[in-house]
Amino acid sequence: MGQVLPLVTRQGDRIAIVSGLRTPFARQATAFHGIPAVDLGKMVVGELLARSEIPAEVIEQLVFGQVVQMPEAPNIAREIVLGTGMNVHTDAYSVSRACATSFQAVANVAESLMAGTIRAGIAGGADSSSVLPIGVSKKLARVLVDVNKARTMSQRLKLFSRLRLRDLMPVPPAVAEYSTGLRMGDTAEQMAKTYGITREQQDALAHRSHQRAAQAWSDGKLKEEVMTAFIPPYKQPFVEDNNIRGNSSLADYAKLRPAFDRKHGTVTAANSTPLTDGAAAVILMTESRAKELGLVPLGYLRSYAFTAIDVWQDMLLGPAWSTPLALERAGLTMSDLTLIDMHEAFAAQTLANIQLLGSERFAREVLGRAHATGEVDDSKFNVLGGSIAYGHPFAATGARMITQTLHELRRRGGGFGLVTACAAGGLGAAMVLEAE
């Protein structure tokens, strides 16, 4: 095993996660239709602070992320500070690491705590797929800039005359990789074919995710970590995630057609995460600061790792790459884990990563390691369901997973939990959590 890297401050304090909260997650254009991500972020941070009863001045830093950014609010973190009654002097900045954005936010706050520049901070993320930055064509954008510089009406009219009808059409945000033009679903199809993952296996994982998420809500396990949202026109509260299909059957999944490779594909809307709106955040502190305030931490951040691979082929292998690093830095193995929570971008991606974590050949030939990371024990894996069921507001998913895993660890009497995710751009993230 490689070098263990303890996550402690200069005084030897562990990094404590004292509280976490999220909004219910909503499918695109449903409960949060028209609510921008910045307002979702304000909603969850304001409620998180109110529930924790931590004085606003105790929070010295807020690091927040948004993947689909709005031009009018480029620093969502600062807008949240200014819009929630937090101390105006609170340091705030925004981060983006695609689907691992709130993993990055947590890591950044942890690094500030370890450096000793702060003693308490908030990390999280929010995204809205219902309020999108609809742009204009490149040609129209260039003409508009030139028109602004033109001095006479005739010059302006001449510039506009260069435009054609198609140049005036609105341009939605890109859903494909900038460097390759591949959509995430195209990559999921690649992975299904590369690793021999069948449609039946994908549908079974998706069904499992929905069944377990529905059971978690039914058992009341999520009530403490999901706030009630009140949104215009305030006719009724929004209480639970609205994507979960608790009454579905495997036969229902089999009815859907492939969404990306129409002829030979196996990836469908049902075995993929839907476009989703929501926000999530966690409060981190040094262990000694939590004790001073009389707070009992949910748990501790034991280690983290970020990785990057090529984007042209099977780029959603982040968990298979980042997990061994995070475990190594924590001084643990897969068998030491009580829980494993992997982001389910697609069932195909999830199953491919599970396969490679247990592959000796992948470990030797690709990772350059002597042995496989370890088999994933199904009894420990995504025990409350995953992103296919809950949905995936890109920047919020990591904070959801961290909070959910820590609560479940505490229900089980403590232990170690792994949270891990793939992300666009061939990125990967993994964190090891500890609860007592």
UniProtKB/Swiss-Prot annotation:
Q: In which pathway does it act?
A: Lipid metabolism; fatty acid beta-oxidation
Report which superkingdom the organism of origin falls in.
Bacteria
Q: Which GO terms describe its molecular function?
A: acetyl-CoA C-acyltransferase activity
Q: In Gene Ontology terms, what is a biological process of this protein?
A: fatty acid beta-oxidation
Question: GO CC terms for this protein?
Answer: cytosol
Quote the catalytic activity from the record: an acyl-CoA + acetyl-CoA = a 3-oxoacyl-CoA + CoA
Question: Which Enzyme Commission numbers does its entry carry?
Answer: 2.3.1.16
Please name the catalytic residues of this protein: 99, 392, 422
Where in or outside the cell? Cytoplasm
* Family affiliation: Belongs to the thiolase-like superfamily. Thiolase family.
Q: Which NCBIfam families match?
A: AcCoA-C-Actrans, FadI, PRK08963.1
Purpose: Catalyzes the final step of fatty acid oxidation in which acetyl-CoA is released and the CoA ester of a fatty acid two carbons shorter is formed.
What protein name does the entry list?
3-ketoacyl-CoA thiolase
Record the organism: Escherichia coli (strain ATCC 8739 / DSM 1576 / NBRC 3972 / NCIMB 8545 / WDCM 00012 / Crooks)
